[in-house]
């Protein structure tokens, strides 16, 4: 569901088409679905960027490139529940096809360790009710979720949901994933049955992603947050999206954070919500300020109310907005920063009240924030980790140089001598 590996897609699609044509598949029987899940449905320009001019012209004008619509009830199918009772909904085009092919990438991801594989199918071609079985506080606030790892309940649910899809289809997904580096360049490409392919691709990805570097724990993390990154323009100014971004860093860096760690982050924080992209987040932010909403998990009870709001659904379907339930996924993640830090400072905010409304401290400069943190939380000689490339390049998951000092390994196994 991201466009980072578009070069892989353009190349791999051509090879896959060659194999399909050689096996007797006709062009008219091929359908491309952009697996956006609850993310904005792709525009024509998005599709052209993903597929490239040649493939776009070959398939777009015949209606053979579409974007997943999780609210198109005619083209969604309910497949029952997993053994845990999680509801499984699936794009009907994919369910009914003879050969479902997933083309994605394997890159460090705070939600379950890596993108790609069964995460792709469990989030990209389903709906909010299925996603609400794992992108929620009861899963994301468990001890096995932080720090980021590939053995959490969330990751297991991805696997279970996707395998349930395979069971009901009567055949597996064919998965083609590129392992990407810090510049989002391809390191390797793995294809085949996801259950067998994922562990192999992760073994290589681990070498780039889980970086065993730190010789000490850090009391202060310092980085900046641009306005436009990851989920789009406004990611670094919309207060709820800011919390998700902060928490994603905690998930990645928890192994090297001290118990009293604080974050100092610069953000323009100018009140730009980008209402067209996230039509519901201003309303959620306002609700968070009232009615006994003390922490973000208190908001979770409103999830179904927002997820079934017809106007917000129409904006998702027809105006390229995020689905309203996506905001609850963001808030579930957003609380993780509060759970794992002593304080978070936003510096340089133009409208600091928005940051304070999320429980963040505000100061004019890094110097002022650091002095306050020294007085209240970290002492006069804190270990400070500056991360100038944050949100500019694909992140790593920082670890202690000695793996035995990590509180948890890459696959969710806790070390008894640590946290």
Residue ranges and their predicted role:
Residues 331-419:
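Extended hydrophobic packing segments that form well-structured cores
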């Amino acid at each position: 569901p991201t466009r980072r590996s578009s070069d892989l897609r353009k190349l791999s699609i051509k090879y896959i088409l060659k194999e399909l044509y050689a096996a007797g598949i006709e062009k008219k029987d091929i359908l491309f679905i952009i697996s956006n899940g609850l993310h904005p449905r792709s525009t024509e320009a998005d599709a052209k960027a993903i597929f490239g001019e040649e493939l776009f012209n070959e398939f777009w004008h015949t209606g053979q490139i579409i974007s997943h619509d999780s609210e198109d009830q005619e083209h969604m199918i309910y497949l029952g529940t997993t053994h845990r009772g999680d509801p499984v909904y699936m794009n009907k085009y994919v369910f009914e096809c003879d050969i479902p092919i997933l083309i994605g990438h394997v890159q460090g991801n705070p939600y379950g360790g890596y993108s790609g594989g069964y995460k792709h199918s469990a989030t990209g071609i389903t709906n909010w009710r299925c996603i609400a079985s794992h992108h929620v506080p009861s899963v994301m606030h468990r001890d096995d979720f932080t720090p980021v790892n590939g053995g959490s309940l969330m990751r297991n649910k991805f696997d279970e949901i996707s395998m349930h899809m395979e069971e009901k289809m009567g055949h597996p997904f064919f998965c083609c994933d590129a392992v990407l580096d810090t510049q989002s360049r391809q390191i390797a490409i793995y294809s085949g049955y996801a259950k067998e392919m994922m562990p192999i691709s992760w073994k290589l990805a681990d070498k780039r992603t889980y970086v065993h570097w730190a010789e000490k724990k850090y009391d202060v993390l310092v980085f900046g947050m641009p306005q436009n990154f990851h989920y789009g323009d406004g990611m670094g100014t919309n207060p709820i999206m800011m919390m998700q971004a902060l928490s994603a860093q905690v998930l990645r860096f928890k192994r090297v954070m001290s118990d009293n760690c604080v974050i100092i982050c610069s953000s323009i924080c100018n009140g730009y919500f980008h209402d067209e992209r996230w039509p519901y987040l201003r309303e959620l932010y306002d609700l968070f300020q009232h009615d006994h909403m003390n922490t973000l998990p208190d908001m979770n009870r409103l999830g179904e109310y927002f997820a079934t709001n017809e106007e917000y659904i129409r904006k998702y379907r027809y105006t390229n907005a995020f689905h309203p339930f996506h905001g609850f996924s963001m808030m579930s993640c957003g609380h993780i920063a509060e759970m794992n830090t002593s304080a978070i400072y936003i510096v340089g905010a133009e409208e600091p009240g928005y940051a304070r409304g999320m429980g963040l401290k505000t100061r004019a400069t890094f110097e002022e924030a650091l002095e306050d943190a020294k007085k209240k939380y970290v002492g006069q000689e804190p270990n400070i980790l500056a991360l100038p490339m944050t949100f500019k390049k694909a992140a790593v998951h920082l670890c202690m140089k000695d793996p035995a000092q990590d509180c948890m390994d890459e696959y969710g196994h806790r070390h008894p001598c640590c946290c």
